[in-house]
Amino acid sequence: MCWTMPSPFTGSSTRNMESGNQSTVTEFIFTGFPQLQDGSLLYFFPLLFIYTFIIIDNLLIFSAVRLDTHLHNPMYNFISIFSFLEIWYTTATIPKMLSNLISEKKAISMTGCILQMYFFHSLENSEGILLTTMAIDRYVAICNPLRYQMIMTPRLCAQLSAGSCLFGFLILLPEIVMISTLPFCGPNQIHQIFCDLVPVLSLACTDTSMILIEDVIHAVTIIITFLIIALSYVRIVTVILRIPSSEGRQKAFSTCAGHLMVFPIFFGSVSLMYLRFSDTYPPVLDTAIALMFTVLAPFFNPIIYSLRNKDMNNAIKKLFCLQKVLNKPGG
């Protein structure tokens, strides 16, 4: 997903005249990382801890939902799919970040860069669409509870989950194919800590206006998903506030509290990353925003879904109890 779009001719017109004397770029160098002598190892271990936490916590959520029959309903099914996507979303960028933190040459191959962009943004797209599906699910459950079971059938839930992932990967494919055919003739320095669409496009030594059109389509898709989610939750909160008993309000709110927290974290981090009043930020601020977007937001999501949810907590406890039983001699 990419909301900020560089000018299609940024950096290309001047490089076109020079491209004949320059060799083709085969790798990109990241300039957003500190050097080893500047203490990059101090960043390595906290990032490794956060990545490990994200993977383990999301695996616990996914496994708990799959193994506990009490959680076999649309809401938890969507949460488990979201956790599964989060595992791969962070894996698309953080392992390479860790590698670059302990390497002298902080580089990535052209093919590796294109693949990282594709999987990172495709997974991000899938998560955004899945969050829209989750908002619609909560809308039906709270605003039309009598027909919920009839509307949100297991078959429909499976179709919505698969459709979210499929659409997320397909919508970016034409743009990535076009980027893979662009000539890059230097420079090859990406002013970021991972391969992102805007920094990479700015290095192309040709016209990128067709890709700009693709970005506009993506922006419209993102705005539509944001509006659907926002309007759904506005309606949900309105209905909850009309429930006469405080116990009923609390019970209804508890079923969507996690979604209400993840929604602003997800779209807030995306907005900070791509909705900019300036094309460039100071390097330190740019890196900090990128870390929040790629690391901190995924770090908080499983905490919200696991620690703040009683049913999920109980399912995870059962998972640990089952593991203890299986580890006993003769178990």
From Swiss-Prot:
Disulfide bonds join C113-C205. The keyword Transmembrane helix applies. It holds the Pfam family 7tm_4. It is found in: Cell membrane. It is a multi-pass membrane protein. Residues 1-41, 92-115, 177-212, 274-286 are extracellular. GO terms for cellular component: membrane; plasma membrane. Residues 63-70, 137-155, 233-252, 308-331 are cytoplasmic. GO terms for biological process: detection of chemical stimulus involved in sensory perception of smell. It comes from the Eukaryota. The keyword Zinc does not apply. Keywords: Cell membrane, Disulfide bond, G-protein coupled receptor, Glycoprotein, Membrane, Olfaction, Receptor, Sensory transduction, Transducer, Transmembrane, Transmembrane helix. SUPFAM superfamilies: Family A G protein-coupled receptor-like. InterPro entries: GPCR_Rhodpsn (IPR000276), GPCR_Rhodpsn_7TM (IPR017452), Olfact_rcpt (IPR000725), Olfactory_GPCR1 (IPR050939). GO terms for molecular function: G protein-coupled receptor activity; odorant binding; olfactory receptor activity. Glycans are attached at N21. Its main location: membrane. The chain crosses the membrane at residues 42-62, 71-91, 116-136, 156-176, 213-232, 253-273, 287-307. Odorant receptor. Belongs to the G-protein coupled receptor 1 family. This is Olfactory receptor 6K3.
